[in-house]
Amino acid sequence: MDYRQPDLSVITVNYNGFHDTCEFIDSWAATVFSVSYEMIVIDNGSTANEAALLQKTYPFIQAVRSERNLGFAGGNNLGINLAKGKYLFLLNNDVCMVKDAIPLLIKRLLSSDKIAGVSPLIRDYAEPHAIQFAGYTQLSPITLRNRAIGKGKINKDHYPAQKTPYLHGAAMF
């Protein structure tokens, strides 16, 4: 058994989403090769014991069942308490990874001591060329609102890494 600390702890919360979670794990396994990681899947009170099914299907993950739904934050906190990685990556179970995303996120995170966390550009699942998230604007002091940068626009690789006051809950590194 390997007792070295993994570079990355990947944490996702599942609630009655076995097929989405399988698609997420498959996309991760097919695209992430350059970092050591542990994957922690929290089954957050699903009707069926999906943790057992996930553990059987993917023996390389750590599937943990919570008998009751702890909510999004509670499920992630359960995973964080189990994590051993140098970095944490909280991901929704309905995301799909793209090749080389992880090394770029780590590089960006380490590029400045002023960076506390990073979120990747997120594309819409149903329309993969449309952007769901490329950052957020600052809160307006007048309206106390902000907006998502690039939301609904076509991704033409014109959204470079930029400072954003908020990370997207679907993918927080």
What is each residue range found by the language model?
Residues 18, 27, 43-52, 68:
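A conserved acidic beta->alpha catalytic loop
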Residues 36-45, 64-66:
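Short beta-strand/loop segment that forms part of the nucleotide-sugar
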Residues 96-133, 139-141:
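Conserved donor NDP-sugar-binding/catalytic core segment of glycosyltransferases
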